[in-house]
Amino acid sequence: CGAGISTAEDVKTAFRLVKELGIESYTDLRKAAASGKISKLEGFGVDSEASILKSLSDFEKKPPARNLLPYAMEVAANIITWLKKNKDVVKVDPLGSLRRQASTVGDIDISVASNNPEGVIKHFVSYPNASRVLEKGQRTASLILPGNIQVDLMVADPKGYGSLLQHFTGSKHHNIALRERALKMGLSVSDYGITPRRQGFAGQGKIKQFKTEEEFYRYLGMDYIPPELREDSGEIEASPNHKLPKLVELKDIKADLQIHSNFDIETSHDLGQSSMKEVCEKAKELGYEYIAFTEHNPSKSKHGEKQIIDLLKKKRQAVDQLNYSNKNSVHIFNSLEIDILPEGGIPVPDAGMDTLDFALVSIHSSFRLPRAEMTKRVLSALSHPKVKVFAHPTARKLNEREGIELNWPEIFEFYKKNNKWIEINCDPGRLDLPDVLVKEAIKYGIKLTLGTDAHHVDGLNNMM
């Protein structure tokens, strides 16, 4: 039924409920529990029924899972392609958290500039992949797509499109700060444009529209602010002084420092699926100058120290041979992603560490340690001289698992003093280090690495 079935015992229970009460849906289960039917079954009782009701209640309170950014981008791209087929569409853009490139996205919002909103709306609601039309108005409409994904459309006059685009891109906090700046200038901002408010101000009360966001920000004495920066994290103050940071683009990226090949060192976690040679060819295609192969460490439970060392020597030889045959091409660093054990140790002997150019360490177990204990654990692993990178540092999995608790100022101070690097993991299900902590790391002057955590050659395309 989708609520709380996570063990073999849960599966047996669900099977009995289906068989004996004919339950086929979440609604059926709730009705059966509320009416007392479950407690009357042999082996259940009142306590079991109450437990099921509590699980259902907890499930109902849980917020719906948000869409991972790459999936939301794909859905939006398909809708935008469809909209562009209509001759009345002058311009089309995503809105909200999708346009700001947030790690997860709720409903997918899209805006269109057009002089014929009726024609655009009619075309939008005829989207062939829609499950149903949720709402259809004169300038707005909503569709439900398979997977219960909602797509909302707004159509604006091209003369005022820039104002609408700016307003509905957000974020909320960015817009509040922008509104405060405008008020100090005697202006009022909205999704329709900017209105003079101060007594005696030229054109008082007459709204000024903007075709583009660039014109909108310029009117407020500001440089254009890219959507990715609109979080009220200093961009409002930096923009008028021409001090906005330059965004990193794909063409700027010269390396991927977390890749898992299928070179078998009998790893503790999942092995990659593509050969080193295949990965090197893809890296060359992407224009990279260097990459790192970072297979998981050999399983400590299945190998003694000598076996681990021998496996790592074997990999060292393979990397050296590939570098020799790859002269004047992509350089390969021999690395490893090593588990940080609960007490802070690492399961690779020093003789094995000596085979590496550098190592990554990461958390794959015991996620709920108290903050002080977890911080001590991480710093202990980072103290090894061969360890340079803390990989997917919060250990979060979007929509699945919250991140670990760490004393980040203490972590960052350690990094600063010991010249360690911290990873931005580009796997769509992680996007870790989160953006807020990236900005903090930069303030400390800490070096950041980028890694796709690819376990297949196609995963190298996840660099974001």
Question: Where are the model-predicted features located?
Answer:
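Charged catalytic cores and adjacent phosphate/nucleic-acid-binding surfaces used
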Residues: 101-263, 273-293, 298, 302-331, ...
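Active-site catalytic microenvironments in core metabolic enzymes, especially phosphate/sugar-handling
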Residues: 335-338
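Accessory alpha-helical DNA-binding modules that contact the DNA backbone or grooves
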Residues: 1-141, 162-163, 183-197, 210-212, ...
